């Protein structure tokens, strides 16, 4: 490979992000893999990479899809080869690995976190999968600890509450909950009822209906033990806490949760997770998002990526609806602002590179 420098979106000294054409292409060693980026998606987490979360010169971005360009000498366990179409979520804006991020012409990832894109999906669809399915897998099968998994379904069809079912993480969670043998109970606005049902929701409720919680309790016989909060606000946490059955259970959010709400029910165990934890490495972002290295999380990442690859291979999961824009990395900056301004609703924003 002759090219030494690349174009990427990188952190600035004043806590922002800019387009640079003189960035270093990641070095490939050990079990890492170099990927030529073909498409990226913009997520809410990208809007939060500002101020103290920015490392000057670090490449931004999490979700990508592309073609394998080079394979490290120790990347021999996952049958990843030059020319493979792959996607995943990595940790952009990483002070410990600043040359690696999704918003670049080339990026890198360890072999065991890569998802092979099946022939039925485009690069653009592949770029929308990583954060949604990685994060929900961690939430459902590690944090909540659902018995069973999509490849070995549970024998008891327990109800699992997915709050915010029409979001990208929501539709991913609904599919995984159903495949794992559970009954996905979800909430969204009435205009999205048919959408979430198409992804496998067994029952859907209007979260704005004043009788919503009582209707959920009636439908589930007051037996919800597990709740995944894809919206993760104080209000959504209060809703989930009230919907969880009398015996208590587990609640997992995708953002730091309210300690005040957590104290209202001692029989409910709260947790919150971040997708990059699955890499098993230290997350050196400011509190409360700092995490120490955790080998157990890395082991789960290996396991869960293998599960997802099997699900993709057999066409058992499908991506959230996407809206595709052209214009490359320069336009990604506009996309981040559109996500921040909530101009994109009900779809994942994807850019072709």
Swiss-Prot record:
Pathway: Mycotoxin biosynthesis
Entry keyword annotation includes Repeat: no
UniProt-listed Enzyme Commission number(s): 1.-.-.-
Top-rank lineage group of the source organism: Eukaryota
Enzyme class: oxidoreductase
Pfam families according to UniProt: ADH_N (PF08240), ADH_zinc_N (PF00107)
Organism: Fusarium heterosporum
Quaternary structure, from the entry: Monomer.
Chain residues that bind NADP(+): 45-48, 166-169, 189-192, 207, 254-255, 344-345
Family matches, as PANTHER family: HYPOTHETICAL OXIDOREDUCTASE (EUROFUNG), TRANS-ENOYL REDUCTASE STHE
Family: Belongs to the zinc-containing alcohol dehydrogenase family.
Coiled coil, from the record: none
Entry protein name: Trans-enoyl reductase eqxC
Changes seen on gene knockout: Abolishes the production of equisetin and accumulates the intermediate trichosetin.
Residues of the signal peptide: none
Positions of substrate binding: 131-138, 275-279
GO molecular function: nucleotide binding; oxidoreductase activity, acting on NAD(P)H
Keywords (A to Z) from UniProt: NADP, Nucleotide-binding, Oxidoreductase
Transmembrane segments: none
Function: Trans-enoyl reductase; part of the gene cluster that mediates the biosynthesis of equisetin, a trans-fused decalin-containing tetramic acid with antimicrobial activity. The PKS module of eqxS together with the enoylreductase eqxC catalyze the formation of the polyketide unit which is then conjugated to L-serine by the condensation domain of the eqxS NRPS module. Activity of the Dieckmann cyclase domain (RED) results in release of the Dieckmann product intermediate.
Protein's UniProt keywords contain Transport: no
Catalytic reactions on record: L-serine + 7 malonyl-CoA + acetyl-CoA + 2 S-adenosyl-L-methionine + ATP + 8 NADPH + 11 H(+) = (5S)-3-[(2E,6R,8E,10E,12E)-2,6-dimethyltetradeca-2,8,10,12-tetraenoyl]-5-(hydroxymethyl)pyrrolidine-2,4-dione + AMP + 2 S-adenosyl-L-homocysteine + 7 CO2 + diphosphate + 8 NADP(+) + 8 CoA + 6 H2O
Cited CDD domains: enoyl_reductase_like
InterPro entries: ADH-like_C (IPR013149), ADH-like_N (IPR013154), GroES-like_sf (IPR011032), NAD(P)-bd_dom_sf (IPR036291), PKS_ER (IPR020843), Trans-enoyl_RdTase-like (IPR047122)
């Amino acid at each position: 490979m002759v090219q030494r420098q690349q174009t990427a979106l990188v952190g600035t000294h004043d806590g922002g992000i800019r387009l640079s054409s003189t960035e270093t292409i990641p070095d490939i060693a050990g079990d890492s893999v170099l990927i030529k980026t073909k498409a990226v998606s913009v997520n809410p987490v990208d809007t939060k990479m500002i101020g103290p979360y920015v490392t000057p010169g670090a490449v931004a971005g999490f979700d990508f899809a592309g073609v394998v360009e080079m394979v490290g000498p120790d990347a021999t366990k996952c049958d990843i080869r030059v020319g493979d179409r792959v996607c995943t979520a990595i940790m952009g804006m990483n002070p410990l690995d600043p040359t690696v991020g999704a918003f670049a012409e080339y990026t890198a990832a360890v072999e065991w976190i890569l998802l092979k894109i099946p022939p039925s999906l485009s690069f653009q669809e592949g770029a929308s999968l990583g954060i949604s399915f990685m994060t929900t897998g961690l939430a459902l099968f590690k944090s909540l600890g659902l018995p069973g998994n999509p490849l070995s379904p549970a024998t008891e069809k327990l109800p699992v509450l997915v709050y915010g079912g029409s979001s990208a993480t929501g539709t991913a969670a609904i599919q995984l909950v159903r495949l794992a043998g559970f009954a996905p109970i979800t909430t969204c606005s009435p205009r999205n009822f048919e959408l979430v049902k198409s992804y496998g929701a067994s029952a859907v409720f209007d979260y704005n209906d004043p009788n919503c919680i009582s209707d959920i309790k009636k439908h589930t016989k007051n037996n919800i033990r597990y709740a995944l909060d894809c919206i993760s606000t104080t209000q959504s946490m209060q809703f989930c806490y009230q919907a969880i059955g009398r015996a208590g259970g587990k609640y997992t959010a995708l953002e730091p949760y309210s300690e005040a709400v957590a104290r209202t029910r001692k029989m409910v165990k709260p947790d919150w997770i971040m997708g990059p934890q699955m890499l098993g490495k230290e997350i050196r972002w400011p509190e409360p998002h700092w995490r120490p290295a955790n080998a157990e999380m890395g082991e789960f990442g290996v396991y869960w990526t293998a599960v997802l690859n099997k699900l993709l291979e057999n066409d058992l999961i499908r991506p959230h609806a996407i809206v595709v824009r052209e214009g490359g990395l320069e336009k990604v900056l506009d996309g981040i602002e559109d996500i921040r301004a909530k101009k994109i609703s009900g779809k994942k924003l994807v850019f072709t590179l």
